[in-house]
Amino acid sequence: MDLCKKSINDPLNWEMAADSLRGSHLDEVKKMVDEFRKPIVKLGGETLSVAQVASIANVDDKSNGVKVELSESARAGVKASSDWVMDSMSKGTDSYGVTAGFGATSHRRTKNGGALQKELIRFLNAGVFGNGIESFHTLPHSATRAAMLVRINTLLQGYSGIRFEILEAITKLINSNITPCLPLRGTITASGDLVPLSYIAGLLTGRPNSKAVGPNGEKLNAEEAFCVAGISGGFFELQPKEGLALVNGTAVGSAMASIVLFESNIFAVMSEVLSAIFTEVMNGKPEFTDYLTHKLKHHPGQIEAAAIMEHILDGSSYVKVAQKLHEMDPLQKPKQDRYALRTSPQWLGPQIEVIRAATKMIEREINSVNDNPLIDVSRNKALHGGNFQGTPIGVSMDNTRLALASIGKLMFAQFSELVNDYYNNGLPSNLTAGRNPSLDYGFKGAEIAMASYCSELQFLANPVTNHVQSAEQHNQDVNSLGLISARKTAKAVDILKIMSSTYLVALCQAIDLRHLEENLKSVVKNTVSQVAKRTLTMGANGELHPARFSEKELLRVVDREYLFAYADDPCSSNYPLMQKLRQVLVDQAMKNGESEKNVNSSIFQKIGAFEDELIAVLPKEVESVRAVFESGNPLIRNRITECRSYPLYRLVREELGTELLTGEKVRSPGEEIDKVFTAICNGQIIDPLLECLKSWNGAPLPIC
């Protein structure tokens, strides 16, 4: 590759960085998903993506696995740099890590380059594992596989002085699903991830303390690992510079960051769709997504978030119903929704921009050459620099973690509104669906748990990179803490998965409650109408009675009153329905004037008959419709099936087999949430999520 020609028009790489952000975030996520699912990752040194790294990391979750192929065209460049090191040493050239010692002790000199590499690996094997091959002190095997991939990609570029055969051996380990055991802790990601990477080198050189895990989870020593992987020729005797090439890089931190960012991008889209579903079940006003509002703010993340929500809500059956509700008694209702709904695009937009920028930063890092010294064969020199400094990892992971915490905070705020009957526009308190609210507390426990999750997530949002300690005799006096930050971000992702699972189950509960509400309100309205006709239309002598004019107002009461405010005992005098129905008749009687003095035309005289018949009929009708609803054959179809958000509901209810939770059943909220959590961890959420947006054209609705 001719670096001079490549950079002549963009020497500072700003144009390349800007070009990488062209197009929508959603299109980028779709591309990431496609790359994640490809069966082969082809490495050439410059085109590795975050999704491909995540794919290799998650190979255990795939039946056939993903294979790695090395570009044969890279062989010559790799060999040239390796040959240069050997030639340089034979000429007596003094080079760091080849003839000179390491770090603060680089003033030491040796002519035994191979022994120096061997000692490098030995003294860096300073990690602690505890007991077992997958203990709390062992790096997750997924991250180790990803790190191996990233390190190969770096070394393929031919600036590191290592033999191609070593890269082929690491590739065989990956393709055979053999994973070296690396310590979880012990790196400051400058000079690279020295300690964990030394254990990969230890396996390649056959160190007796090396351990690996085989395809079926079995524990392997170095010899067994080579045998299973089909690596012939015995362990590697490292040549000068090769040990340094293996350990002096940012592969572990950037690999973990890649895994984290693949999932973070999915969660960014999910948060947009869940906010739209929240709007649907809350009977929210969709005007908060109007393009002009967001165009005037200029931020692309916000504009896209609003456009995605607008797309979900456009034509939504819930929005049409909500519009009618808002037109009823408009002066008695809030003019606008609360912030968790109304400002969700403004809240999520910056988080999406942060996650997207972090993704690009890490993609540049995993395609970078980040060891020291760098071998420039074309100019016949070794360059001593600091590309091993993993600051892009530490900074991008701190930023990503803060973005994830903000997404979680919004979810918690929306969840809190959803379960609160003061705010949720007629849904029952705690989203209880049972007949007796005194014995059904719905999602109360889940809300407490959500507060716990959110608190932990907010704590994790604190930065790691401001806790740098001077290391290695003050040679590494500033260091990135990249892997530490990536590990904390991985924890944040896990918590956000739990929060998303809990929230999605609650949203599906709310969807079903709206469905139940519609079925029950229909029968209440019909029953009130029928009872009114039977008891209020005719007088004692068959004449038309003035009370008949009350029916319209009685039905308006049914429309206005929240169904779940009286559903458990619809004819209770303590509940608003009966009180307000009576008030309608009293008001009509007061207007009846002198006619009230005549027993045959008195509306007051009709109140008792109306109430008695309603008490005799309405509870039975409500219970009958509820029983039909619970049997799975409701009279009115669920509106969600007509909405673009339906694929997520279908996943939770039909594919995962969750159900409407009530205090009358044994099943707990946690059991249902666990099903969704497992599905999210397995990636089952991705296709339904993208299906919700399959018809979006990538632009907001035009301003008309």
Swiss-Prot record:
PROSITE patterns: PAL_HISTIDASE (PS00488). One of its GO terms (cellular component) is cytoplasm. Signal peptide: none annotated. There is a cross-link at residues 190-192 (5-imidazolinone (Ala-Gly)). (E)-cinnamate binds at residues 248, 336, 342, 372, 444, 472, 475. It comes from the Eukaryota. The active site is at 96 (proton donor/acceptor). It catalyses: L-phenylalanine = (E)-cinnamate + NH4(+). The modification 2,3-didehydroalanine (Ser) is found at residue 191. This is a key enzyme of plant metabolism catalyzing the first reaction in the biosynthesis from L-phenylalanine of a wide variety of natural products based on the phenylpropane skeleton. This is Phenylalanine ammonia-lyase. It comes from Solanum lycopersicum (Tomato).
